[in-house]
Amino acid sequence: MTKDIVLGLGNNIDYEIEWDSAIFENLVHEFGIEYSEIHPVGEVQTQRDLIISILSYMKEGKGGECFVRSSQIIEDFSKAFRKKITLGGTSVRAAIAMSKIGYSSALHLVTMNDDVRRLLPPDCEYICSAPEENSYPHLIIQFTQNHSIRVQDKIIRPKQANRIIYDNDLDNILMRLDPRMSQLLLNAKVFLISGFNAMQDQSLLEDRLEKLLISMKNLPKDALVFYEDACFYNKNFSRIVRDKLLGHIQIFSLNEDEFEGYIGRKINLLDPLEVLRSLEALYKLIPVPKIVLHTQYWALAYGRDANSLKKALKGGITMGGTRYRIGDDFTRQNYFEMEKSAPQKEGAQFSDRINAMKQGEICCLPCVEVNDKNVTTIGLGDAFVGGFLPALVH
């Protein structure tokens, strides 16, 4: 394999349901859910738990990822709605996004089935570690400010658009690594690492990290390693992954929810001083050459010679905005039209102010203005990665 962009490590099938507030309200009534019960749910044990969890996220206007006890809960819930089957996983969505604008990649996969073969870009090369074919669907819930739900005499209306992911995916829990990974990396200029967040066994996680580092010895000396963070079911596992990989990562990338998770509080993303102080605190925890942070208002690079990532940031913002506006079925022309779109006013003001505060160490660009009401909220970070990485190579 000769691809210079290699993307890993996991993949999956998504059930993207077509949201219908009337159907969901009927389920709320059917399960006798009261407003006082709406609170965050840890592990989803039943379909009733699932409905309460969705209501809790909508009430807060937040996104997240949750483990369900059984995939049957996902199957049963999704039967009530129309749904679209798509590919999930940061690496696969990034591969699909960059293929739309003419860049191909090589993938390490952990799940294989007819849907994966059907939906992968034809120009992608791949290896897969799965010993047999399986499908462990992830349930994708997307909501906007226009979606309101009545629970008893209360109305829940999200503060902002977001998405929730529910899954029980054995292939990603086990995260088997294909021994051919070493050969896949021989000619890589950029290597994306993502996907350890679903793992649940510490000894297994440590084994996979050791195997990954052995494979990474085959990377060319000038290859760039890009790590995309995620919401870990076990927060301690996030620390284990960081401790093992930080010395091998050039860029550590994360979104606003993950950023706030590390800092431990809500952050005003339009306050440059607060964001800068939080970035400085994050850097003490994650001392890598560059941190990339992508949010709903702006995206930035933090670290020495941050301006070297300006083109990549622009590519990521453009790709994320294109997916947000159009969804899966955008075209190359849609991408280049988005590239010329006006920036968000708030994001532009923030970018100007924070760039002036730390010249040379911060490069911040505003997101584009998108006023469409029916938007896509799943896979925006993955699309950002798909727009960001090609600029590092080409």
Residue ranges and their predicted role:
Residues 381:
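Conserved single-residue anchors adjacent to enzymatic active/cofactor-binding motifs
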Residues 388:
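Active-site-proximal C-terminal subdomain of hydrolase catalytic domains
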Residues 1-375, 393:
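Ribokinase/PfkB-type carbohydrate-kinase core domain
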Residues 378:
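Catalytic tyrosine of NAD(P)H-dependent dehydrogenase/reductases that use a Tyr as the general acid/base
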